[in-house]
C-alpha cells in the first residue's frame, strides 16, 4: 500500500507541474479503485501489514466458520451477499485466526482505495458500495452489521 501511496503522490505532483493552470481549477478529488481487500491500520495511523487483496484465496476455512458462528441464513439475510475469499470480512477472520498479534493491533480496517483517501485527507471512511462489498454491512439499514460484528468478536 505504501508503494501505491507513493505512486499516487508522484502522479498528482507530476500532473500539477505539467498542467498548472488546470490544476488551479481543481475543486475536489474522487476515489475509484479495487473493491475487495483488507488494509489494517493501527492506532498510530500506520499500516500493520501488507494488504490482503481480492485474489487471495487463503480464507476459505474462515468462510464456513463465519457461517457457523452467525448462521448462514441470518448472515446472508443481513448483508444480502454471499461470502467469498478475498472479501474484507473473510480476510479479517483469517488474520484473527492466524495472525493474532496483528489482529490485536488493528484500530481501523479499510479497503485499498480508502487507504489512499485516508492518506490524502486524514479521514477514515468509505462509500456504501464498498461497504456492502466487504460483506459485513447491513444493506437494508445502510449501516455496519453490528450484530454480526459482535458475534464474530471483531
Q: What do these predicted regions represent?
A:
Residues 61-65, 136-138:
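Short, charged, surface-exposed secondary-structure boundary motifs
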Residues 66-70:
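Short, surface-exposed amphipathic charged segments that create phosphate/polyanion-binding patches used
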Residues 1-49, 61, 77, 105:
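N-terminal glycine/serine-rich phosphate-binding loop of ATP-dependent small-molecule kinases
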Residues 49-50, 127:
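Short capping micro-motif at the N-terminus of alpha-helices
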Residues 4-11, 59-62, 91, 112, ...:
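General structural feature for long, well-ordered alpha-helical segments within catalytic domains
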Residues 52-53, 130:
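Residue-level structural signal for beta-strand termini and adjacent loop
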Residues 56:
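Carbohydrate-associated surface elements
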Residues 75-154:
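Gly/Ser/Thr-rich active-site cleft segment
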